[in-house]
């Protein structure tokens, strides 16, 4: 009996030891996997590093590319497009002006009544219209007729105090956010469609002429006096209220910058210099590229798999279209190599662009003790119902690294513009303010991105110079900015002044 008991005890002890060994191996495996997660995070943090020295190199590279782009066509990754906007709004404008904002699957029509410096914008009305999918791939005539019909309906709703002055034609600012070769303030040929549009017979045509023909067909007596993109519109909107505005930056789904340049510094300009001595330059800075940019394997893979490999590298590192996707790629690697979410990679995590930047922002801003928002996004967006607090903290860390890098190199880009304009140093006895107008959903809604960008710019400038540089939100530049440019380039300006 005693032998049997001893035998049973030995068997039992062996079983316990075996179970303990399995548990130890599991813990070691788990510990090893977690170590791999931390190694991937550290590697990401190192590769995304933005020390001040590197950011200053990025800023200097931006300034060099700006000079090259102004010297001759094709000499720089920056197009440095001449906008033909040589008169920015001053606040003196008065009268009724319209704007049309076409940049996606919806377009807006807007009218403003301007009352000069005392009253500024007296009244403002707008309407938003969806474009039927079939018109995005139809003919040029069909699309512009549809837009002209909407304009006609909008004009018909003018109230008693919102009519143009007697014997004056209505004037329109046209924000057209597609690649255009501008040939004057009110003309430009379409280079190519983007954003789901594919209307072959518009390519190579003057989009203002196409709209004008459609307005004639639909009985709309209106003249396009300014063709602009949303960034130039934002600059105009900012300058209308503050004469110290020198540049505008869009940080949204995409990104771009425009600024006011001395006309004499634009060496590729062959026409007579404008009377104002100034010209707004549309930088198209999303295409900026430099060896100093902190690119990672995730950025390189994203670029290679994109519709435009090798192009828009800066935009792919800082804009709302791509930030969430970079985070997804990092999380996918952690899931694949270190089982971050369990033994199998969640199927939804394999889907490109499933994690949008607003989702990333929501997780990044989660201040709840158990990171409930992160848990909710994992479940609702990525189909991951269960996650530990430890895993959720890692996800917030990844969001922080990617957002901080984007914000810091955005600040370096802005510094590049400030340097080009010679506003990065203080001249003796001068304390001139320089205002940068910012717009776009990323800047407006992603608070941690915005705060990091502003802090980084201050650090790059130094306390004294930072006091003279102001970042200001300029809302709805693509709408009201276009109407203001229609006013500042009105055909009736000389009559009004005489």
Swiss-Prot record:
Metabolic or biological pathway: Carbohydrate metabolism; hexose metabolism; Carbohydrate degradation; glycolysis; D-glyceraldehyde 3-phosphate and glycerone phosphate from D-glucose: step 1/4
GO molecular function: ATP binding; D-glucose binding; fructokinase activity; glucokinase activity
Topology in membrane: Single-pass membrane protein
The enzyme's E.C. designation: 2.7.1.1
Domain of life: Eukaryota
Keywords of this entry: ATP-binding, Chloroplast, Glycolysis, Kinase, Membrane, Nucleotide-binding, Plastid, Plastid outer membrane, Transferase, Transmembrane, Transmembrane helix
CDD domains per record: ASKHA_NBD_HK_plant (cd24020)
Gene Ontology CC terms: chloroplast outer membrane; cytosol; mitochondrion
Gene3D superfamilies for this protein: 3.30.420.40, 3.40.367.20
Catalytic activity of the protein: a D-hexose + ATP = a D-hexose 6-phosphate + ADP + H(+); D-fructose + ATP = D-fructose 6-phosphate + ADP + H(+); D-glucose + ATP = D-glucose 6-phosphate + ADP + H(+)
Location in or out of the cell: Plastid, Chloroplast outer membrane
Membrane spanning stretches: 4-24
Binding, D-glucose: 194-195, 229-230, 256, 284, 315
Main localisation: plastid
Chain residues that bind ADP: 104-106, 253, 441
Stretches the record annotates as Hexokinase large subdomain: 229-476
Function description: Fructose and glucose phosphorylating enzyme.
The protein's name in its UniProt record: Hexokinase-1
Organism: Spinacia oleracea (Spinach)
């Amino acid at each position: 009996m005693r032998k049997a008991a001893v035998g049973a005890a030995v068997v039992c002890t062996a079983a316990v030891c075996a179970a303990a060994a399995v548990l130890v191996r599991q813990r070691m495996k788990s510990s090893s996997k977690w170590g791999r997660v931390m190694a991937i995070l550290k590697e990401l943090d190192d590769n995304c590093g933005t020390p001040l020295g590197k950011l200053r190199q990025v800023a200097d590279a931006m300034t060099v590319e700006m000079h090259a782009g102004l010297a001759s066509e094709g000499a720089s990754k920056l197009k440095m497009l001449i906008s033909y906007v040589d008169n920015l709004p001053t606040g003196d404008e008065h009268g009724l002006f319209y704007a049309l904002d076409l940049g996606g699957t919806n377009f807006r029509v807007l009218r403003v009544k301007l009352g000069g410096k005392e009253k500024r914008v007296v009244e403002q009305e707008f309407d938003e219209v969806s474009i039927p999918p079939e018109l995005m791939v139809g003919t040029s005539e069909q699309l512009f007729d549809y837009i002209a019909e909407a304009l006609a309906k909008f004009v018909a709703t003018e109230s008693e105090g919102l009519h143009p002055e007697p014997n004056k034609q209505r004037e329109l600012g046209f924000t057209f956010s597609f690649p255009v070769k501008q040939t004057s303030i009110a003309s430009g040929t379409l280079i190519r469609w983007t954003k789901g549009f594919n209307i072959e017979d518009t390519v190579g045509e003057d989009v203002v002429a196409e709209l004008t023909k459609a307005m004639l067909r639909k009985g709309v007596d209106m003249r396009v006096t300014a063709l602009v993109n949303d960034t130039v519109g934002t600059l105009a909107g900012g300058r209308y209220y503050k004469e110290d505005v020198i540049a505008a930056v869009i940080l949204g789904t995409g990104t771009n910058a425009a600024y006011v340049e001395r006309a004499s510094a634009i060496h590729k300009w062959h026409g007579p210099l404008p009377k104002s001595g100034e010209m707004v330059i549309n930088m198209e800075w999303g295409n900026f590229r430099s060896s100093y940019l902190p690119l990672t394997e995730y950025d390189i893979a994203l670029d290679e798999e994109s519709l435009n490999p090798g192009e828009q590298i800066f935009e792919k590192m800082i804009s709302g279209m791509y930030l969430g996707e970079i985070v997804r790629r990092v999380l996918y690697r952690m899931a694949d190599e270190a089982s971050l979410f369990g033994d199998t990679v969640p199927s939804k995590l394999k889907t490109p662009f499933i994690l949008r930047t607003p989702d990333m922002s929501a997780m990044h801003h989660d201040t709840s003790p158990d990171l409930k928002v992160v848990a909710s996004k994992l479940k609702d967006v990525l189909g991951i119902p269960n996650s530990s607090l430890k895993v959720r903290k890692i996800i917030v860390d990844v969001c922080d690294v990617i957002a901080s890098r984007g914000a810091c190199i955005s600040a370096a880009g802005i510094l590049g513009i400030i340097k080009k304009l010679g506003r990065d140093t203080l001249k003796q006895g001068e304390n001139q303010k320089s205002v940068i107008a910012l717009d776009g959903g990323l800047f407006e809604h992603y608070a941690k991105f915005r705060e990091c960008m502003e802090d980084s710019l201050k650090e790059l400038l130094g306390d004294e110079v930072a006091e003279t540089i102001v970042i200001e939100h300029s809302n709805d530049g693509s709408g009201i900015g276009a109407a203001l440019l229609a006013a500042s380039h009105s055909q009736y300006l000389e009559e009004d002044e005489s």
